[in-house]
């Protein structure tokens, strides 16, 4: 998959935006547990009072607190409050740092004052020890004490307070502030409700931002993935279109179809999921760990154990399942291949009553794929239950450990709740990556297969400086000591072939099956390049011309008629779309196709099904010939194109064709002698070698191979 990342360059801007949105989404997601904790800790337990800094306090109460403050701290406090009648009010604009400083200053004095003014036995004992009678205002009595005695007493109390948990000091300070507000007649319930509303609104806003960010990420990632899929399909298509026959033989047609469709679809899906999950999961997981460490580290061991267990389980799971993932796409190829062969070969299968055999072939490929899929899915079914077990175990351990922490005063209930939520988010991030890991191996295989196509070197390529043939020479084809061997084959298919076809000549090629006839003519349009010698068109080696330039001069009719979905008209115009309607009709007339076209209600607008499945073999072949004629090329190549025609149609077509192509060069590969009797030259091939060349009469005298072929097909009277 990494190798295909270079095809995302066009979407770099979108990717940067997606990453920014993912960070925003993660920030909002990770803020929600903190707000939940604040609602429990501050909103419920502290009545909406956030810290030990009173917004409003009586002067007498402040004087009592100052008894237990350092002189510098008392001056600092005075700087932040202003008088309002008998009360002191906190100034409006105060920074977060200043508030934290005030919170630290007020904390311990508030604990001391709360203890001394309470009705507890502990308070009474402390007052008696200091010699303050019961019923006396302790703060008034303490204010009358000598400074040295008060300082000594304060040091003893502070020493004890220093041993207390920070959370206990904070809670004592909050309790003091709440009691002060109540004493002043403030509506504490309103303060609590205002805090709950404000925090709730912030939570809703965070949730809305999270939702909007997630929607934008889904939209943008889908767009990027679709764009990449579009580009890959275009690249693979253009690459495959540029393949020579050598590369087509390397990849089966079924495999190329799978790579262009299913494999690219796999990558597109994974890319869309990758931005939404693979990138988001680590951001969320790492962010969750940071938030946990910032709040409290006493229970992080629970997360550590959970993460180790998850990673160990995933490593074991993929060690078992990964080889099967790799094999899946190959098995899909095999099933596609078998299915394609069966569907295209149904007439032959029925004719030979081989339905049972083909059913077994299909069943074998299908069962193999199904078993592998089942094995992979069974492995993956363990994933979710194990993850849920770990998640639930983390929750139980957190509650168990957290209850002790709450009891000892080192944590608050809201902190435990936040830890559970952060733990779930961290584990969910692993769960998301795990869910993606089901698709990643198959996508990785698909990416390798697509990359294999894209990185395949095309054996037939255009030259850097192509040569244009002279306008004076048109329609000549020359083979100069040409030999050819298929890649990785030990022997030549054709060896040392030399001949020349001039403009207006008809050159026929004949020979036994497998003698190299089709291979020979495939060298002209550069479906292959000769391994030795040269093939020249219009006096120029075809390897020095662009493939388009060579093929624009050729009208090629393959051995098997091939039509495309559309209409009769669109198929005839395929090689030259801009020709007139009269030219289309003329091409059909020369190809003897009008006799069946005129019988159809829609005539030239008659639909042609995929592969021409709604016309007969002879009709398909005549339309293929009409297509080549309509192109009006310099050179016609007929690769045994008349074999599907009856003798009468064959004879009529050849007469019309000879008249139409008298200014062009015609090369015909034939099996039937009757098709080529009147050819200007006949090239005889025998096991890849040139056994003879000449006219029919010359070869009957000089070439034994030709004579045997001729005598096996026609009588002596017909050959005379």
Where are the regions that the model predicts?
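Helix-loop-helix
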Residues: 291-308, 312, 375-449, 453-454
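An intracellular "coupling" helix at the cytosolic face of ABC transporter transmembrane type-1 domains
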Residues: 135, 146, 150-153, 245-246, ...
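Transmembrane helices of ABC transporter permease
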Residues: 17-24, 273-328, 397-411
């Amino acid at each position: 998959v990494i190798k295909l990342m270079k095809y995302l360059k066009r979407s770099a801007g979108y990717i940067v935006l997606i990453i920014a949105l993912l960070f925003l989404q993660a920030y909002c997601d990770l803020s929600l547990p903190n707000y939940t904790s604040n609602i429990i800790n501050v909103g419920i337990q502290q009545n909406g009072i956030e810290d030990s800094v009173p917004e409003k306090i009586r002067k007498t109460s402040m004087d009592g607190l100052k008894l237990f403050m350092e002189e510098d701290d008392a001056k600092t406090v005075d700087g932040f409050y202003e008088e309002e009648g008998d009360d002191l009010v906190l100034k409006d604009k105060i920074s977060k740092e200043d508030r934290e400083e005030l919170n630290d200053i007020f904390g311990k004095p508030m604990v001391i004052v709360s203890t001394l003014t309470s009705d507890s036995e502990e308070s009474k004992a402390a007052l008696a020890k200091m010699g303050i009678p019961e019923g006396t205002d302790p703060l008034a009595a303490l204010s009358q004490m000598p400074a040295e005695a008060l300082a000594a007493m304060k040091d003893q109390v502070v020493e004890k307070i220093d041993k207390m948990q920070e959370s206990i000091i904070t809670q004592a300070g909050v309790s003091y502030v709440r009691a002060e507000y109540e004493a002043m007649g403030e509506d504490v319930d309103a303060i609590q409700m205002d805090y709950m509303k404000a925090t709730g609104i912030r939570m809703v806003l965070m949730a809305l931002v999270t939702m909007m960010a997630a929607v934008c990420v889904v939209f943008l990632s889908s767009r990027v993935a679709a764009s990449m899929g579009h580009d890959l399909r275009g690249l693979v298509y253009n690459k495959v279109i540029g393949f020579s026959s050598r590369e087509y033989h390397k990849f089966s047609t079924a495999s190329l179809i799978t790579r262009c469709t299913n494999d690219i679809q796999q990558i597109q899906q994974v890319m869309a999921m990758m931005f939404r999950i693979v990138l988001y999961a680590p951001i969320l997981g790492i962010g969750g760990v940071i938030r946990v460490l910032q709040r409290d580290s006493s229970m992080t061991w629970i997360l550590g154990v959970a993460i180790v267990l998850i990673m160990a389980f995933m490593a074991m799971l993929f060690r078992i399942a990964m080889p099967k993932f790799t094999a899946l796409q190959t098995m899909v190829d095999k099933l596609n291949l078998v299915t394609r062969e069966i569907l295209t070969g149904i007439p032959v299968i029925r004719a030979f009553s081989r339905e049972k055999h083909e059913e077994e072939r299909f069943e074998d490929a299908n069962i193999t794929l199904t078993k592998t899929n089942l094995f992979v899915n069974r492995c993956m079914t363990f994933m979710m239950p194990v993850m849920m077990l770990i998640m639930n175990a983390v929750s139980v351990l957190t509650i168990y450990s957290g209850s002790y922490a709450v009891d000892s005063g080192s944590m608050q209930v809201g902190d435990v709740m936040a830890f559970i939520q952060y733990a779930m988010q961290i584990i969910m991030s692993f769960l998301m990556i795990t869910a993606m890991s089901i698709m990643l191996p198959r996508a990785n295989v698909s990416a390798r297969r697509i990359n294999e196509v894209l990185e395949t070197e095309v054996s037939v390529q255009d030259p850097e400086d192509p040569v244009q043939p002279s306008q004076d020479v048109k329609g000549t084809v020359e083979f100069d000591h040409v030999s050819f061997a298929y890649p990785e084959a030990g022997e030549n298919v054709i060896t040392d072939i030399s001949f020349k076809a001039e403009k207006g000549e008809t050159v026929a090629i004949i020979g036994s099956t497998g003698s190299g006839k089709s291979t020979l003519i495939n060298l002209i349009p550069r479906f292959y390049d000769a391994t030795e010698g040269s093939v020249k068109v219009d006096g120029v080696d075809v390897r020095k011309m662009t493939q388009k330039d060579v093929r624009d001069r050729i009208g090629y009719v393959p051995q098997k008629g091939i039509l495309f979905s559309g209409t009769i008209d669109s198929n005839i115009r395929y090689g030259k779309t801009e020709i007139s309607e009269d030219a289309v009709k003329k091409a059909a007339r020369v190809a003897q196709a009008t006799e069946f076209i005129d019988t159809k209600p829609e005539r030239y607008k008659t639909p042609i099904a995929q592969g021409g499945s709604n016309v007969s073999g002879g009709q398909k072949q005549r339309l293929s010939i009409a297509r080549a004629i309509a192109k009006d090329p310099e050179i016609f190549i007929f690769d045994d194109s008349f074999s599907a025609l009856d003798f009468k149609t064959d004879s009529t077509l050849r007469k019309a064709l000879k008249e139409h192509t008298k200014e062009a060069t015609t090369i015909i590969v034939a099996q039937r002698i009757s098709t080529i009797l009147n050819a200007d030259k006949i090239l005889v091939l025998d096991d890849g070698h040139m056994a003879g060349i000449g006219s029919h009469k010359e070869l009957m005298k000089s070439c034994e191979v030709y004579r045997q072929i001729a005598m096996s097909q026609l009588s002596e009277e017909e050959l005379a």
